[in-house]
């Protein structure tokens, strides 16, 4: 009889300890950071495994276009489960320009996020995406500047939407740097349009052989292009760039984790090994007035004025 009592007591004790362990684990199991992105996919959460393990948080990525993010946030209001928005272009910021985002405060200082660039409407620029020129090494068409695409060579792009950012750089240079020479600007843009031809995707095993103008991320993520040994990539001396950016959703349910994510990115902002997962380059340290530099905020302003 005593043995039965001892056994039952042991069972109760084990069950009690097991229940306690479940209760203690519950808060961790429910810690989650939800990121809405127009370029990340659910599988990309693996690149944040270090943060996930350190903070004991599950990172969920919802892939949707910037305009869909805008619609979702407007529809959900403060009931949204999205904590952070992560876009691949200034065009994404433009699309979301009427959406309010949360100022990041509460103990954060500029020093803590020193590798990120704060811009208007509480966005953080976290990486740049240069416009590159790519052609076959044995091609007779070998431009070294963007300007030549407007006058000497036929070109195309697999991502025509991003060319709007490129053209905003051209407009900025002429309006701000070259005395607002409208005639030359129109000639530049007209020539760029006239020299553009239709993009040919290629086949499942053969990449396009055309002269391309595209963002570096688009090139690096296109396996056929990136693995084509005969193709060369040029970074023009006066480099135009688009930018990746993130912003915190107002009253984010997991606000503390969004701050941890920003800190994590800041720690890896200059790691080429980390950034290459996303086709990014580290942000420029060049300041206005020192070397060739066009402020992303100036480009964003020009994009906004186009509508």
What are these regions (language model features)?
Residues 1-8:
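Bacterial N-terminal signal peptides that target proteins for export
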Residues 8-16:
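Bacterial N-terminal signal peptides
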Residues 20-94:
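Early extracytoplasmic/lumenal segment of secretory-pathway proteins
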Residues 38, 81-82, 88-207:
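Extracytoplasmic ligand-binding site segments that recognize negatively charged/polar headgroups
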Residues 90-96, 205-231:
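A ligand-binding cleft/hinge motif common to bilobed small-molecule-binding domains
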Residues 113-116, 129, 186-192, 226-250:
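Periplasmic-binding protein-like
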Residues 132-138, 242-257, 264, 273-277:
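A bilobed periplasmic-binding-protein/Venus flytrap-type ligand-binding module shared by bacterial periplasmic
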Residues 253-256, 263-307:
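Extracellular/periplasmic juxtamembrane helices and adjacent flexible linkers that interface
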């Amino acid at each position: 009889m005593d043995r039965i009592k001892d056994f039952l007591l042991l069972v109760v004790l084990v069950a009690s300890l097991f229940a306690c362990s479940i209760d203690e684990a519950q808060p961790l199991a429910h810690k989650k950071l939800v990121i809405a992105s127009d370029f990340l996919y659910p599988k990309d959460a693996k690149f944040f495994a270090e943060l996930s393990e350190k903070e004991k948080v599950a990172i969920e990525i919802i892939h949707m276009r910037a305009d869909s993010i805008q619609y979702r946030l407007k529809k959900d209001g403060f009931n949204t489960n999205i904590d952070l928005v992560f876009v691949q272009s200034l065009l994404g910021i433009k699309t979301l320009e009427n959406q309010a985002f949360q100022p990041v405060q509460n103990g954060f200082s500029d020093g803590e996020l020193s590798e990120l660039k704060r811009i208007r409407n509480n966005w953080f620029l976290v990486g740049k995406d240069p416009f590159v020129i790519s052609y076959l090494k044995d091609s007779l068409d070998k431009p070294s500047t963007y300007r030549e695409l407007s006058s000497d060579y036929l070109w195309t792009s697999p991502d025509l939407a991003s060319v709007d950012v490129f053209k905003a750089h051209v407009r900025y240079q002429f309006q701000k740097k070259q005395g607002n020479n409208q005639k030359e600007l129109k000639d530049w843009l007209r020539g760029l349009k006239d020299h553009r031809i239709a993009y040919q995707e290629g086949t499942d095993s053969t990449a396009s052989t055309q002269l391309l103008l595209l963002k570096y991320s688009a090139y690096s993520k296109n396996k056929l292009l990136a693995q084509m040994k005969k193709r060369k990539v040029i970074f023009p001396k006066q480099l135009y760039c688009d930018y990746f950016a993130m912003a915190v959703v107002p009253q984010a349910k997991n606000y503390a984790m969004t701050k941890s994510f920003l800190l994590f990115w800041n720690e890896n902002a200059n790691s080429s090994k980390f950034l290459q997962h996303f086709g990014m380059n580290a942000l420029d340290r060049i300041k206005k007035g020192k070397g060739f530099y066009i402020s992303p905020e100036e480009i964003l302003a020009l994009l906004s004025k186009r509508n």
